[in-house]
């Protein structure tokens, strides 16, 4: 029997979370998959914390809740290191990626020193995020030559032992663009990738993480972070 921890960083996702956990849990039980949900709650202010306490009573949840905001990168890393199953899937809690993408790849799980990564086909995000990603991918390809279609896709499956080979300090270089840095660091560590097409959906409720006015600062910090990973 396969066993997997699903890491969900969560911030103000009260409207999405119950539907998300319910659908994932039902599908995984039908496939007889041993699973747990590692919910890394990040200082939500919309009632998400209270909802998670209720969901804990019904579902296999590890609740990593904090009163302050640690940020996406630290949330993902905390989730990885709190997971107990053989495999770990890291993905987002905005319900833009469905459990179907995991179920369809149960026979395609990665070996050691390998990650199964998604590319959103097609990607259903706001125009400003699509433009930013296309431009930033040019820099990422110049630095790392990853050959991946979608290096920032938040759908990554790997063995726990493979995740543990990564350097937490270097992953923290990318405070706001975690998956770009994650892929770059893996390339530096000679870890391989299998890339799969996954269906991507528009966000039904809530807002995307970054505002347009913050984008210039994010771009500058991410460029510095990628360069530090490259030369580190």
Explain the meaning of each model-derived region.
Residues 1-3, 15, 145, 169-232:
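Hydrophobic helical membrane-anchoring modules
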Residues 2-4, 25-39, 60-62:
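Short loop->beta transition adjacent to catalytic acidic/histidine clusters or analogous donor-positioning motifs
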Residues 13-28:
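Short, well-formed alpha-helical segments that are part of the catalytic scaffolds
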